[in-house]
Amino acid sequence: MKLSLKAEIEVYIMKIGEYFDDYEFACSCHRHEVDENGHNKLDHIIDKRLVDLLDRIRERLGVPLYINSGYRCPEHNAEVGGASNSQHVLGTAADITYDGIDVDYLASIAEECGADGIGCYYYQDFVHVDVRGYAARWNDLD
């Protein structure tokens, strides 16, 4: 049975968390978004702890967050020069920003909200957050 375009869109775009849709976490290469049956795989790849963290950050910040990079398939991660053990490949990391970003302020909110890994990227105006299970801090000024 062929679905209508509206039904196809509704099946593809699934709300995960309070503020985010699954497509916001998709690998930008779009190579591995669906399984062999045509079902969206992102709801199985993205760690719920990450979604919960981002919801808390968004709530605390009070303005929309934008996900620059969420899940990355291993191939795309290698293409962009990501670490081989990148949290993005595990579905446990996101690079986030907001309009008028203050990197230090966003990083402090991420820490208050329980982020494990926090990377400040001042030159590109985003903060990496993850739920790796232990604390890690870095920035692009080092």
Residue ranges and their predicted role:
Residues 11-20, 65-70, 99:
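Short, exposed beta-strand "edge-strand" segments with a Pro/Gly-rich flavor and a Y/T-containing core
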Residues 46-53, 63, 76, 92, ...:
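Amphipathic alpha-helical interface surfaces
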Residues 1-60, 124, 133, 141-142:
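Extracytoplasmic cell-surface/polysaccharide-interacting catalytic and binding patches
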